[in-house]
From Swiss-Prot:
EC numbers for this chain: 3.4.11.-
Source organism of the structure: Escherichia coli (strain K12)
Protein name: Putative aminopeptidase SgcX
Gene3D superfamilies, sorted: Peptidase M42, domain 2, Zn peptidases
Residue numbers binding a divalent metal cation 2: D180, E213, H329
One example of a Gene Ontology biological process annotation: proteolysis
PANTHER family: AMINOPEPTIDASE, AMINOPEPTIDASE SGCX-RELATED
Cofactor note: Binds 2 divalent metal cations per subunit.
GO MF entries: metal ion binding; metalloaminopeptidase activity
Database matches in CDD domains: M42_Frv
Gene (name only): sgcX
Amino acid sequence: MSFSVQETLFSLLQHNAISGHENAVADVMLCEFRRQAKEVWRDRLGNVVARYGSDKPDALRLMIFAHMDEVGFMVRKIEPSGFLRFERVGGPAQVTMAGSIVTLTGDKGPVMGCIGIKSYHFAKGDERTQSPSVDKLWIDIGAKDKDDAIRMGIQVGTPVTLYNPPQLLANDLVCSKALDDRLGCTALLGVADAISTMELDIAVYLVASVQEEFNIRGIVPVLRRVKPDLAIGIDITPSCDTPDLHDYSEVRINQGVGITCLNYHGRGTLAGLITPPRLIRMLEQTALEHNIPVQREVAPGVITETGYIQVEQDGIPCASLSIPCRYTHSPAEVASLRDLTDCIRLLTALAGMSAAHFPVEPDSGTTQEAHPL
């Protein structure tokens, strides 16, 4: 049966997986990888790794990765009344929290709830126009009191996810929670399906990582075992085709996958990625040869695992492919199935290249003469 991008994505979106609670998605990734990979394992932190391609010990090692976790919440306190206080896990958009429907993964199974908001009829002044902070909010699961909530399987530490089943919009767009980064996980499975029947010159490691939304470093144990020569991440990036962002950058939905030139943490440049120009050339040349649309991006405020991967070992050259996404970290993210398909095509083409085409070493300084100090 041929690989279906939409069916795979929608299947992954059915699962809930805040940081540190990725088991449901990990089980799917393990099952799919085991169909065709030469080697599959899950480390103690929860990362899922699948190896494809060359068995030669000196083969070039390309690592392609995406994270399984999504933004969400965690129960902090059960009030005597049965209402639940909670904390954010990762960075769910605070302006969309009040009034959202959520799913709690309780000890006895999923429990539906909603994030309460002061009744509009009694709201005054700023209460009608401003979003409350998380400490002013609560989750209502319909419990009569604290004991009732506990009987339902809820306790301190219960994970909470946003609820919004995937919907297909016009022009091959999809709307759902957790497109960040089930889009990337879908791309991994698409690449796995494509390369499983190819004769590869290199070894390809596909990695579904954990805790990206929480500490961005959950993938580190994989690096120390795989020791990749290059790494390419798959994640989302804000699409700037909406009325509020149309002047910010040229990244657009349905215009191809983004190639990151620069990203960094929104509160300073303490972590981020400046993609080596040689890797940008490799990605753009490969895309050109296979007629795959791509677009460059500079994305302050965006950070992925590449910011930490690049400084492991002797330095790991990193690139990041970004799937444009509207309304990021909200319950209703929107992205394009076409862009996702283009991402899979580009990564498959890269995996099929010979080792000689991968610029592992830095560019030489051939444009000016070097003099000793």
